[in-house]
């Protein structure tokens, strides 16, 4: 019966130990979603202008 409290304490410690090992995300890893979206539009626009000139954006 003495093992039951020890087992319960170990079960409670396991989730907290895994969260301590996770490193916080730094700001340099963050990529603004707007820049990703703009890059995708730029690439699609460039490919579209090569194949179909009518779909090019003005400006």
Curated annotation (Swiss-Prot):
Residue ranges the record assigns to the propeptide: 20-46
Free-text tissue specificity from the UniProt record: Expressed by the venom duct.
Entry keyword set: Amidation, Disulfide bond, Pyrrolidone carboxylic acid, Secreted, Signal, Toxin
Residues with PTM Pyrrolidone carboxylic acid: 47
One Pfam family it belongs to: Chi-conotoxin
Disulfide cross-links: 48-55, 49-56
Subcellular localization: Secreted
Signal peptide positions (record): 1-19
Positions where Isoleucine amide occurs in the chain: 58
A Gene Ontology molecular function term of the record: toxin activity
GO cellular component: extracellular region
Note: Negative results: does not have the ability to interact with the G-protein coupled somatostatin type 3 receptor (SSTR3).
Family: Belongs to the conotoxin T superfamily.
Domain notes: The cysteine framework is V (CC-CC).
Protein name in UniProt: Conotoxin ViVA
Organism: Conus virgo (Virgin cone)
């Amino acid at each position: 019966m003495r093992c039951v409290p020890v087992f319960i304490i170990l079960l409670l410690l396991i989730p907290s130990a895994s969260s301590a090992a996770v490193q916080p995300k730094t700001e340099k890893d963050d990529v603004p979603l707007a820049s990703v979206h703009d890059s995708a539009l730029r690439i699609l626009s460039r490919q579209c202008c090569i194949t179909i000139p009518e779909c090019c954006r003005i400006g």
